[in-house]
Amino acid sequence: MDHAGDAMRTDLMTITRYVLNEQSKRPESRGDFTILLSHIVLGCKFVCSAVNKAGLAKLIGLAGETNIQGEEQKKLDVLSNEVFVKALTSSGRTCILVSEEDEEATFIEPSLRGKYCVVFDPLDGSSNIDCGVSIGTIFGIYMVKDFETATLEDVLQPGKNMVAAGYCMYGSSCTLVLSTGSGVNGFTLDPSLGEYILTHPDIKIPNKGKIYSVNEGNAKNWDGPTTKYVEKCKFPTDGSSPKSLRYIGSMVADVHRTLLYGGIFLYPGDKKSPNGKLRVLYEVFPMSFLMEQAGGQAFTGKQRALDLIPTKIHERSPVFLGSYDDVEDIKALYAAQEKTA
């Protein structure tokens, strides 16, 4: 079979070329999305460089301010947020930005507006910077009907309305995972070229995995279905092997491993935090979008995660996401609890 003419050759496919290829499949496209994405990619490159130099540049210490979530901000958080706000604003393709670091949504001035809303966590897992654990940027993109009259309602949409979502992981390599609604692809930054190259084409999560990922330190406060599920992972009664526990504590790293190897990532609600800790718009939705596009599932304990309609920009929700069959197992436990309630 001759692959010479294959437009999807992974050794040559940059993220820019990939997005242009996708654009050519949509006759109605005017290139706005491509321009927006190129600005997100630029932001990721900048943050990747800053993360790599953090120790040398003395960026690691606390900036002395506290963000809307009550977390002490790291200097890198502040820098990353500024980078993405500026990159997205200067694209001329956005009208509303929602960042994990900012209390209010940012409405772009009319002369610079475009038809997209971007929700993002500029540096997820930043408490892990000091010890060298992988951290990352998470983003989701919505399209609005009329950017001139855009309101907060244009952002408070269910995740299924997103037109694209992705994350960039800053670890042993800089990896950008993206879905524009037709599958999931992974790109790795080649430092010598300064380009993201397609290294993981058409990612599909295995139907069932051997790994579960959860903070078991919260186990005493879990609800019944979560407790039963984790018990089943550790002590299966059907003769299967126990699942392995892998938990990094950086959502991007834990979800990335789950996406590639299969299994399930759990961040349940508990007695202390009934709605869990993860934010709906810029953590739960983008990761759920990617999981579904890769053939997996995402569930809140009550419904499909992408069907959730947020009422506040920093709203939180429990989430169970990963391999299709593994999420089915936890859904069955919640359904059984509903019947007995």
Swiss-Prot record:
Single Gene Ontology MF annotation: metal ion binding
Keywords linked to the UniProt accession: Carbohydrate metabolism, Cytoplasm, Hydrolase, Magnesium, Metal-binding
One GO term of the biological process aspect: fructose 6-phosphate metabolic process
GO cellular component terms given for this protein: cytoplasm; cytosol
Recorded superkingdom: Eukaryota
UniProt catalytic activity: beta-D-fructose 1,6-bisphosphate + H2O = beta-D-fructose 6-phosphate + phosphate
Gene3D superfamilies: 3.40.190.80, Fructose-1,6-Bisphosphatase, subunit A, domain 1
Compartments where found: Cytoplasm
Positions contributing to Mg(2+) 3 binding: D121, D124, E283
Binding site for Mg(2+) 1: E71, E100
Residues at which Mg(2+) 2 binds: E100, D121, L123
Presence of keyword Transmembrane helix: no
Main location per the UniProt record: cytoplasm
Binding-site residues, substrate: D124, G125, S126, S127, N215, Y247, Y267, K277
Names of the cofactor(s): Mg(2+)
PROSITE patterns the UniProt entry points to: FBPASE
Cofactor: how bound: Binds 3 Mg(2+) ions per subunit.
UniProt-listed Enzyme Commission number(s): 3.1.3.11
Note: In plants there are two FBPase isozymes: one in the cytosol and the other in the chloroplast.
Family designation: Belongs to the FBPase class 1 family.
Name of this protein: Fructose-1,6-bisphosphatase, cytosolic
Organism: Spinacia oleracea (Spinach)
